[in-house]
Amino acid sequence: MAQRQPHSPNQTLISITNDTESSSVVSNDNTNKGRSGDNSPGIEALCAIYITYAVIISVGILGNAILIKVFFKTKSMQTVPNIFITSLAFGDLLLLLTCVPVDATHYLAEGWLFGRIGCKVLSFIRLTSVGVSVFTLTILSADRYKAVVKPLERQPSNAILKTCIKAGCVWIVSMIFALPEAIFSNVYSFRDPNKNVTFESCTSYPVSKKLLQEIHSLLCFLVFYIIPLSIISVYYSLIARTLYKSTLNIPTEEQGHARKQIESRKRIARTVLVLVALFALCWLPNHLLYLYHSFTSQTYVDPSAMHFIFTIFSRVLAFSNSCVNPFALYWLSKTFQKHFKAQLFCCKAEQPEPPVADTSLTTLAVMGRVPGTGNMQMSEISVTSFPGCSVKQAEDRV
C-alpha cells in the first residue's frame, strides 16, 4: 500500500501573500488523486484549529464593526487619528471576511477549491489588507510626530477631509502593490520527486523557480515589514526626544497646564506605538518562516510535528493581528472604552457635564475709539471661559 502524505497548510512554502503554504496533494502515482497523509492532524488538533479560527473571525468582526460604528455615530470621535484607525479596521474586516475563512478550509478540504479567479482575487485582497495595515500605521506615526512637534498649531478647517484623502491614498498604494500579485498568481502543480507526489497550490510564481521564491519573500519582508517599521522607529525616536526636551523646558508658571498637554500627547503616541508593536509581533514569525523556506533547501513539506506547530502558530498569530486592535484601544482609551460598551450593550454613552470648577473668569483690556470725539479709550471686560473652548480643538482625541 502506498504511503499517504501529510495534509498540512505548508506543503510547499509559507507566504504572507499567496497560498503556496496551503497547497494540497493532487495525485500520487500509486494512490488515488487527492488523498492526504496518514500522519495528518488528528481530530483533536483539527477541532482546536477550527475553534481558534472561529474565535479570530467572530471576535475580530465584532470588535472592528463596533469600532467603525463608534466612529460614524459619535461626532466627538471623528478626529484625525481616529480616521486612520477606522481605515485600519476596514482593512482588518476585509481580511477576516475573506482570507481567514478561506485559509481555514485548507485543513479540511484537499486541493485548492476556489479556482484560478479565486486565487487571483484572494491573493490581491490579502496583500492589500497587509499593505493597508502597515502603511496606515506608518502615516499615523508621521501624524503623531507632527502633533508632538507642533502641539499648538491650529488645524485647518479641511483637516478631516485631507486626512480622509490620505487614508484613501493608502488604500490606492496598497492596491497598486498588490496588483502584480493578482496578475501573476495562478494555480500551479509541482512534483516532489522524493515522495512521488504531485502538489497543487495557489501562488504568484511557479514553485520550482527557486530564485523567484527568494526574490518574492525578500521583497515582501522589506516592503511590508522592514522599511515601514524602520520609518516608524525613526518617527518615534524623534517623538521621544521632543517629549524629553519639552519636559525639561516647562516654565514654572505654566507647569500644570503644560504637563497635562504633554501627558495627552504621550497617551496618543503610546496608543499608536502599541498598535505598531502588535503588528510587528504578530507578523514577524510568518515572515521568518517564509524566508526560511525560500532560502533553504527545505522546498517540500517538513513532516516534523514541531514544524507543523510553528506553521500553525505563525498563521494564527498573523491573522490575530486583525482582531486585536479594537481591544488594544479599549484598554488604552477610556473614551473609546465608554463608547465601545455603549455600542456593545446598545445603550447611550453618558455625556458628563463640565464641572463648574473648570470655568475661569478672565479680564481682557480692549482699546477702541470713542464715537464723536476721535479719542482712544481703554476699557476692561470680563470673559468666562469654559472647557472645550480653547484654540486647539479636540482633533487628537482617541
UniProtKB/Swiss-Prot annotation:
A GO term for molecular function: neuropeptide receptor activity
SMART domains: 7TM_GPCR_Srsx
GO terms for biological process, alphabetical: G protein-coupled receptor signaling pathway
Main subcellular localisation: membrane
Protein's organism: Macaca mulatta
Ranges of the Extracellular topological domain: 1-40, 103-120, 184-219, 293-312
Keyword entries, A-Z: Cell membrane, Disulfide bond, G-protein coupled receptor, Glycoprotein, Lipoprotein, Membrane, Palmitate, Receptor, Transducer, Transmembrane, Transmembrane helix
Annotated S-S bridges: 119-202
Source organism superkingdom: Eukaryota
Lipidation feature positions (S-palmitoyl cysteine): 346
Gene3D superfamilies in alphabetical order: Rhodopsin 7-helix transmembrane proteins (1.20.1070.10)
Membrane topology: Multi-pass membrane protein
Signal sequence extent: none
Cytoplasmic side: 63-81, 143-162, 241-271, 333-398
SUPFAM superfamilies for this protein: Family A G protein-coupled receptor-like (SSF81321)
Pfam families reported in the protein's UniProt record: 7tm_1
Chain's role: Role in sperm cell division, maturation, or function. This receptor mediates its action by association with G proteins that activate a phosphatidylinositol-calcium second messenger system.
Protein name, UniProt field: Bombesin receptor subtype-3
Compartments where located: Cell membrane
Residue ranges of the TM segments: 41-62, 82-102, 121-142, 163-183, 220-240, 272-292, 313-332
